């Protein structure tokens, strides 16, 4: 089974979050740093908000931080593009009857917006949202759970991801 990440792997969206982070921090007079990026990149929303609150010593609640991020990113996902070669590869895999699923740290509404707009959902059996499970992609329990969900041995899965 082929498992695909979305942001940065299938679609060109990583700059969306850099732009959101820069704007969020600028509103508070804070710099966008490598240390900040490393703390929030490729993690699930609630953990990124917790990190942001603590790292930046903000009075905002984690819920308010996430709501502001959602507002800043809402239109961006309607304008992302497919990474070069992705559509042809997915089409080839589908023609070869390969099983494919999406596993993402992206927020569900952003994922659905982008994937539906780009016509990519038709290639995947389903989507697993790390955020809904409360498990980061770097945690092997996520991948073991995904394999179990699809009734396949983990050793038979191939992962396409830009961050692991």
Region locations from a protein language model:
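Structural motif
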Residues: 40, 103-105, 160
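Hydrophobic "anchor" residues on beta-strands that sit immediately upstream
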Residues: 1, 101, 157-158
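Short, acidic loop-to-helix structural element flanking the phosphoryl-transfer center
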Residues: 75-102, 108-112, 137-140, 144
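Acidic donor-binding loop at a coil-to-helix junction in glycosyltransferase catalytic cores
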Residues: 17, 161-162
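N-terminal helical cap/lid subdomain that shapes the substrate entry/recognition surface
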Residues: 1-87, 91-96
